[in-house]
Amino acid sequence: MQQMATGLAVTGCGSAAPETSLDNHGLSQIVDTSDEWIASRTGIRSRHLAGPDDTLAKLGAIAAQNALEMAQVEATDLDLILLATSTPDDLFGSACQIQAAIGAKHAVAFDLTAACSGFVFGMITAAQFIRTGVYRNVLLVGADVLSRWVDWTDRRSCVLFGDGAGAVVLQANDTDRLLGFALHSDGCLHDCLNVQYQGEARPLTGEINVSQGTYQPISMNGKEVYRFAVNRVPEVVEKALFQSDLKTDDIDWLLLHQANQRILDAVAKRLKVPAEKVISNIANYGNTSAATIPLALDATVRKGHIKPGDTIAASGFGAGLSWGAAIFQWQR
């Protein structure tokens, strides 16, 4: 039976990060770098790293519980759990592990992989289920443990990444607080940023071989990714604003994927968004992929800076290459 269409609102957020952190001075003991070199080029001062006993599912579950508590929603009332990640504990996915950990026994759970764009892509996916009336309460988790796939001898990339998780609760609402969005992908640029599988032939019979191997560390063309981000992100934000019938001046907060402070500054400058409206916590977390947006959102909300009704322009961008933006109002 066709359900009645409805709006949606973001009603709670939460986050989690491993206890262990590694600052730039500590990193300089591992590779030839320095705090000044890293901070001046990336804005990063420290990053949280998952230890041997930390799991992505554990971090995701903590973030989820914090978001549910803020939204005043019971886990048993959830209809759907979406996990945006590229680094699950289980290659088949970790959303069901989070479902079990928080006791969301009635919720459907599955992973969504869109790298650093994953949280925005996940938000729009969740919105379709709510807007069509299929589900009313959705938990969206963005979590990554990129330290598993970093080459800790490569000073160009190992300085960038950290581990963490963030989550939001999206609920059916009479007034639709998701005002507009735009999503894009360009597979022709895949080689700019990837974690490639590398296998070797293993003979099964005289005529049949299979490939067995593992994934290689993160490979990134930093200059191309920077050029891509500073050109495409302002475009997609403006496209989402146009769909929302809003202008840049209507934005209360610009919430970008925390990839590099230089990218945040360049995008804000192109959009003519003042620095005081740009949310940034990259100094303490680094690039946590799908977790950056909800991590930064949660910190800003809990500091009391984001108020009910504030308009937030969020944009994720990264491997694929993929990029997207969502314009939404904070409900709580």
Curated annotation (Swiss-Prot):
For molecular function, the Gene Ontology terms on record are:
3-oxoacyl-[acyl-carrier-protein] synthase activity; beta-ketoacyl-acyl-carrier-protein synthase III activity
**Cellular location(s):** Cytoplasm
What's its top-level EC category?
transferase
**Stretch list, region ACP-binding:** 258-262
Tell me the function of this protein.
Catalyzes the condensation reaction of fatty acid synthesis by the addition to an acyl acceptor of two carbons from malonyl-ACP. Catalyzes the first condensation reaction which initiates fatty acid synthesis and may therefore play a role in governing the total rate of fatty acid production. Possesses both acetoacetyl-ACP synthase and acetyl transacylase activities. Its substrate specificity determines the biosynthesis of branched-chain and/or straight-chain of fatty acids.
- What is said about its interaction partners and assembly? Homodimer.
Which family does the UniProt entry place this protein in?
Answer: Belongs to the thiolase-like superfamily. FabH family.
Name of the protein this chain belongs to: Beta-ketoacyl-[acyl-carrier-protein] synthase III
